Regions:
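Glycoside hydrolase catalytic-domain context in secreted enzymes
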Residues: 1-192
Length: 192
């Protein structure tokens, strides 16, 4: 086990930024001098979507189990089902050398027009938090990390990098943050 604080203090600003930006779409940058390897991440809220480094076309992904969309599995309100789904995804990630699965999508559904509603668990913060925690616990039980996304109030695809989600602090605290808080407290995802 590494002393993380010591390791970070030994990194240059450029090395820290490199870990945030990545070597390519699916790998973090490695830091050879400190023994930090690259990490392969892969999309996959509903199944592993691993692609070659040079491939961006989702139709060129490896063959993998495809689960129903989160909005469908959430209808079951079955924590054990989500745990089992997570375990299966964790096993597939290990078989394909994927270290971190980019999911689950925990953000709350705000509009029926949101382009990511299919992958968001629910418009209900309690349901989204409980089921995402089970999913995360399943994946991470196989020593594969998860990355809960798309952090708080990212509720549209059109101009999503430049739009503003204006709301009161009360709305953030009562509707958007609770699902993330539950997931973090009950499952401790490796990344947010």
């Amino acid at each position: 086990m590494h002393d993380i604080d010591k390791l970070i203090s030994e990194m240059t600003l450029e090395e820290k930024a490199g870990l945030c930006s990545g070597a390519d779409f699916w790998h973090t940058k490695k830091v050879d001098r400190l023994g930090i390897p690259d990490v392969m991440v892969s999309d996959g809220p509903h199944g592993l979507r691993k692609q070659d480094i040079d491939t961006v076309d989702p139709n060129e992904s490896i063959k993998a189990v495809c689960f129903p969309a989160a909005c469908a599995t959430a209808c079951s309100f079955d924590r054990e089902l989500m745990l089992s789904m997570g375990e299966t995804l964790g096993e597939e990630c290990r078989a394909e050398d994927v270290s971190v699965l980019l999911g689950p999508a925990v953000n709350i559904k705000r509009s029926p027009l949101c382009g990511r509603n299919f992958e968001y668990i629910s418009e209900d913060p309690y349901l989204a938090g409980e089921l995402s925690a089970a999913y995360i616990n399943g994946v991470q039980s196989k020593n594969v990390g998860t990355s809960i996304k798309h952090f708080a109030a990212n509720s549209q695809e059109t101009r999503r990098m430049t739009c503003s989600s204006d709301m009161s602090e009360r709305t953030l605290r009562e509707i958007y943050f609770p699902a993330f808080e539950t997931a973090v407290k009950k499952a401790q995802p490796w990344t947010v």
